[in-house]
Amino acid sequence: VASAHLALTNSELDMASIDHERLGVDFGANQMFSTPDVLSDGVFQCDEGGKFDFDRWGEEGLAGMEPLWLLKYLPNMPACHIGIHADARGPNNSLTLAEASGISAMGEALAIISTGRADMMLAGSTGSRIQPTKCLHAALWDEMAQYDDAAPGTWSRPFDASRRGQIAGEGACTFVFEEEEHAKARGAAIFGSILSSASCCVIDVDGTPRTQDALVGAISKALERAGVSPSDIGHINAHGLGSKQADIDEANAIHQVFGASASTVPVTAFKSVIGNSGAACGTLELAASLIGLQHGVVPATLNYSTPDNDCRLNIIHGEPLKTDNKLFLTVNVTAFGQAAALVACGV
């Protein structure tokens, strides 16, 4: 809600004069996790000699849960409360696709505007991977970075040969989307334009995610819809998770789509700065590129010093890259084989 409020303030939108029936919300969000103490009473009711008895949950476990537990943690709450805050009575939707949520929500918001269902959309995403329960899940299931001989601020090392995994982050980012003519007519400050977005999910029949193929599908379709070729792209804001295999899969996907230019197109990985904020990362990374391009630069990747021969990418590091090319690609992918890509142009 705070990010949406700041976006509306920055947009200088006259809220008293707009048609609120034509203002909508499309927001990506992680699954919301309650803290362990919220669930503990119900879980203890089902304890049988130190083991959880699922058969007792319906009658005994639920009785230990607060009645409004589910409503407090539904991932549509961000879009709901943003809609209330802005009195946005147009289309309202929530997407929960882990790290692919932000780009997917923005793509859907653009489709709503282009089909005439709204004049403006508040599009964005929010996520936290530092919430206690989510941290526990990440520690159990994800490849988390840890170094005994380095400061924590250096642990996130996307595409670096010494990388050991991701670090947890949190955040939220909201954009006000509208047609260019609509924005110019009201004298809005324009940060950039979205040319296209695309998503792709590839999973084997046995449930194994094929993240490289998903990325290839999303990137290829986004470029095709934008009517641009790989050689037109000024930089890529990569997913850059920082885990060993995930970065290799992403690099391979870039090489597969970009061909000979894959080793030269500048690549930045903003998770080196903010960590993995889950659903929020797509919008935060788009904002980083757009704000950088306003100053004629692309943000650098932190903690990158040793190239990985398995990636072979032109990673921007050391200092921001000066550029006149405003066209760029940003991509995200989940551990479950869901990928999203977006082509944008800065100002």
Task: Name the predicted role of every residue range.
Residues 1, 18-20, 69-75, 94-102, ...:
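Active-site nucleophile and cofactor-binding loops and adjacent substrate-binding regions
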Residues 1-86, 90-92, 127-135, 230-246:
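Conserved beta-ketoacyl condensing-enzyme motif
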Residues 1-13, 75-79, 83-86, 92-127, ...:
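Active-site-proximal alpha-helical scaffold in enzymes
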Residues 19-20, 226, 230-232, 263, ...:
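Flexible, low-complexity linker/loop segments at domain and module junctions
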Residues 34-51, 113-115, 135-148, 214, ...:
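A glycine- and small-aliphatic-rich helix-loop capping segment at beta-alpha/alpha-beta transitions
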Residues 47-65, 107, 111, 115, ...:
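Glycine-/small-residue-rich "gating" segment that lines the acyl/pantetheine channel
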Residues 117-164, 197-210, 240-248, 264-314:
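Acyl-CoA/ACP chain-elongation machinery
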Residues 149-228, 234-235, 347:
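Condensing-enzyme catalytic core mediating Claisen C-C bond formation in acyl metabolism
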